[in-house]
Amino acid sequence: MKISESWLRTWVNPAIDSTTLADQLTMLGLEVDELAPVAKPFTGVVVGEVLTVEQHPDADRLRVTTVNIGNGEPLQIVCGAPNLRVGMKAPVATIGAVLPGEFKIKKGKLRGIESQGMLCGASEIDLEDKIDGLLELPEDAPVGLNIREYLKLDDNIIDISITPNRGDCFSIRGIARDLAVLNQLEVTPPDIQAVEATLNEQKQVHLETEGAPRYLGRIIKNVNVKATTPEWMAQALAASGIRTHSILVDVTNYVLMELGQPMHAFDLAKLNGAIHVRQASAQEKLTLLNDQNVELNEDIMVIADDAKVLAIAGIMGGLESSVTDDTQDIFLESAFFAPLAIAGRARRFGLHTDSSQRFERGVDFELPLLAMNRASQLIQQFAGGEFGPITVAENTALLPKREAIELNQQQVSQLLGYEVETDFIADALTRLGCQVAVKAQGEWVVVAPSHRFDITIYQDLIEEVARIHGYDNIQIRLPKIDVKLAKYQDHLELGQLRQTIATLGYQEAISFSFADLKLEKQLNPDVNPLALANPISSDLAVMRSTLLSSLIPCVQHNLNRQQNRVRFFELGLRFDYQNAASIHDLQQTPTLALIAVGSSVPEQWHGKTQPMDFFDLKHDIEQILAAGRVKVEYVRSERAWLHPGQSAEILIAGQSIGYLGRLHPSLENDLDLGVTWVAELDQQAILQSYVSNFTELSRFPSVRRDIALLISDKINVSDIQQLIKQTGGDLLDSTWLFDVYTGQGVEEGKRSLAFALLWQHPSRTLEDAEIKSGMDNIIEVLENTYQATLRAS
């Protein structure tokens, strides 16, 4: 929005220069995009009066004039302007004048006739040309007065970018209000007096829609629509980028820019009956002031009479009821339209008007009467007329409510991060137009003014305090962090985990936490997943209880595209339904999931690839857990969706942290998959295992002893290893299986298992007797527990 600096200073005039004024507006949140002079610098141009006009003897298009500039003898000037005439007043560039573009005026001759200056058009003094020819000045323009002074060309135009929340600042009044508060000055508005009614004639107004809580109208008769717009008004409008049209249009535009209230004048003779503010009917048509034909529908609010639509409310008037040069009587409108009733309607018709721009953001609902009085005052002053009483139609229940907001000193300090004086807070809010009541020391109850639609919560009030106190006054201090920061080590370990899995040939998948109900039931029939109220698709309708319900579709997608080796992992969240008595008990568990199909290694030239098996997957799991140097155990898994003979639970310190294995063949068949290997582990357990626990390495020699056992093939190897570890005690450092044999020499139903046992003491060398005693105890326990026997060498 563009405004004249001099116009703004008639409302509030702080003792600061133009640049500082622009900086203050920007710091108030009214960002100044440009501060530019009304006209470029020039000198030596004054108001002149044409005394005589004679034809040039040697040029048909030139004439010789004498011009009075109020200083000595009249000047002889040769001019070719078509509108040149005796008695007119126009700008005169005298000898020595320098016009924009460094154009210097010198004494010269045109076709043999001496010319002592130049009569100027608008463009020659950096103004917009309205006509072809000289810039005609009013008859009362003082001869000899510097044209820059007379036309106020030493003024500046301030171009301000108004944010959507500050609809109240689309006017001189709104900007002056904030500027006055910042500089602790009083606003000096024009003296607006109500124009008394001189005739008793009114239009009935019916409010038939909730979008128009307040509507004012006034009949004005015998208006001189051909009256000349005063120069000061034309200059103010020109500075705002608004062309002058006629006195009525110029007055309503002036009130729009001055007070921020859109207004409209209808030709009274073209209105039939009462005024109705209503919603349009489907397919109602209207020709707008810009000659655009539009078709309306039920969500468009209109102004109508008893017979037809007159205007789109808050956007643009209709051509049929518009004021023309033949208009004598008018009906003047000033209203409050609800922002939501106007928002988006103008753009629907490809329009963007000053009126819609303001109503969309919110116009002060207490402003229509003041604006009506101001417009009436200006019309009476410059166009005359007889005025009827002001008709007020309103539904106060539909006017915006001004709710009380509680504010205290602590809230201000906490949000801003520094102390603002109590008196300043109350004073600033009061000067901004808020109603401020003291509740207690440092506590207030505040009601926002009618023009501020953006103040609804206490944070909005604190923002106002900060604006007026000055953003540049915010103290420089180090931030105070009250929140608990995430441990960097956790992020480091998570990144390390991702990198470890990626080096094993898996690609990371990132999927939704939503899953297909059917797949969830196939994986775990006992689970009743939480259904989404508004799923994005039918196959993403529940919250997943396992990451496999997200990874399996990824595998299917890739297999269907000729990818015969697929390996994915995901670090994500799953819902734990097991211990949830209600929805409120549900918890999400960070989980690592693996899925693999195809060969154990990519196809290679130097060797035959083998299908992936249980031990390949177990190797990957052990690589993932190896960084933690924790002791991992495996026991048979009883999960229904896993292969009963090729799956296991993963234990650390006796607690299950997940599982690994092959999907059950029947499930593979249902899902149209080949042999598919999967694993799921508790992510937190993995990261906790990464915590380093250092123990001093023994400097004393270790001793290895091997035993080969004949034992039933029904007994799990993990159970045997667990028993060996428990029996061996602290001196047994580790044990592992290194040979399995069945066949000749081993009776049916049994197998030979060979274990290595590593013995070591942390602070001394073990004696043979100690090792022998330990070995004997282990063999005895195995014999008694599993009927194991030593295999003969």
UniProtKB/Swiss-Prot annotation:
E.C. numbers: 6.1.1.20
Binding site for Mg(2+): 454, 460, 463-464
Catalytic activity: tRNA(Phe) + L-phenylalanine + ATP = L-phenylalanyl-tRNA(Phe) + AMP + diphosphate + H(+)
GO MF entry, a single one: phenylalanine-tRNA ligase activity
Any GO CC annotation of this UniProt entry: phenylalanine-tRNA ligase complex
Subcellular location: Cytoplasm
Pfam families linked: B3_4, B5, FDX-ACB, tRNA_bind, tRNA_synthFbeta
Residue ranges constituting the tRNA-binding domain according to the UniProt record: 39-148
Quaternary state and interactors: Tetramer of two alpha and two beta subunits.
Keyword Disulfide bond on entry: no
Family to which the UniProt record says this protein belongs: Belongs to the phenylalanyl-tRNA synthetase beta subunit family. Type 1 subfamily.
Record bears the keyword Disulfide bond: no
Every B5 domain range: 400-476
SUPFAM superfamilies on file: Anticodon-binding domain of PheRS, Class II aaRS and biotin synthetases, Nucleic acid-binding proteins, PheT/TilS domain, Putative DNA-binding domain
Note on how the cofactor is bound: Binds 2 magnesium ions per tetramer.
InterPro entries: aa-tRNA-synth_II/BPL/LPL, B3/B4_tRNA-bd, DNA-bd_dom_put_sf, Fdx_antiC-bd, Fdx_antiC-bd_sf, NA-bd_OB-fold, Phe-tRNA-ligase_IIc_bsu, Phe-tRNA-ligase_IIc_bsu_bact
Record protein name field: Phenylalanine--tRNA ligase beta subunit
UniProt xrefs under CDD domains: PheRS_beta_core, tRNA_bind_bactPheRS
Organism name: Acinetobacter baylyi (strain ATCC 33305 / BD413 / ADP1)
GO biological process: one example: phenylalanyl-tRNA aminoacylation
Keywords: Aminoacyl-tRNA synthetase, ATP-binding, Cytoplasm, Ligase, Magnesium, Metal-binding, Nucleotide-binding, Protein biosynthesis, RNA-binding, tRNA-binding
Positions of the FDX-ACB domain: 698-791
Cofactor names: Mg(2+)
